[in-house]
Amino acid sequence: MVGALFILGEGVLKKPVEIIVTTDYSSMIEAMRFGRIEVGYFGPFSYVLAKSKAPEIEPFGVGVEKGKPNYQSILIATADGPVKEIADIKGKPFAFGDRASTSSHLAPRAHLAKKGLIGDADYKVVHLGQHDAVARAVAAGQVPAGALSEAIYRVLVETKKVDPAKLRQLALSEPIPNYPMTVQGFLKPELKDAIKRAFLELKDPTILKLFRVEAIAAATDRDYDVLRDMAKVLNLDIAKL
């Protein structure tokens, strides 16, 4: 992806590009909030959090994968462990990733809430930070169940970083809108429009492959209301997160 951003920035926009890789979602939100980043590629829920703190941020693009601008979380359990179905999670630890992650926290936690399982009341919430850490911990039996991005899970299986024989698939979450591409609202209109066009009109399969998408479709803030609804299910006050 870094290479793709350089190509777009310096090749298409004719502008020098500085790539900033933040350590986690929270630091990226703060960098965007205080204007240290002009273009940001957020996780869906981290975008919602960022938008609540910096309303001027504008989503404009979303990656399309397998013909869809969305993805899902997968809830998994240790194959030979005590969790055979969702109901078995009650009274046990459950692993999530980053607190601001959509597919390894918000979506699966909302999914469990809709099944009558409330975090830290019906099961112990464990945060492991990264998607792959969740998969590895569950496969090793360190925690009996957990959740991560279904797409990342498939990559971990395909690259043999986790053994699917050691895992049981419990459920998939409802569809989640893909990661939004965002731009600072304070940029000059002509630059902002040029950035949006550079992404939305992108057809080069080589560059798209670097983004790990088939195409980039237009996105609006309203597309992410589903995340705000999930937060309501969990009684989360987005403004205070």
For the regions a protein language model found, what residue spans apply to each?
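Extracytoplasmic small-molecule ligand-binding "clamshell" domains
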Residues: M1-S46
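Sec-exported extracytoplasmic/periplasmic mature domains
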Residues: E10-K14, R33-I37, S52, A113-L117, ...
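Pocket-lining segment of extracytoplasmic ligand-binding domains
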Residues: G81, K90-E190
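Immediate post-signal peptide segment of exported/extracytoplasmic ligand-binding proteins
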Residues: V83-P93, V233-L241
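An extracytoplasmic/periplasmic, membrane-proximal ligand-sensing/linker region
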Residues: M1-A4, I176-N178, T182-L241
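Acidic, polar ligand-binding/catalytic clefts
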Residues: E30-D88
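Short helices/loops that flank or line small-molecule/ion binding pockets
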Residues: S26-G40, K53-A54, A87, H131-A151
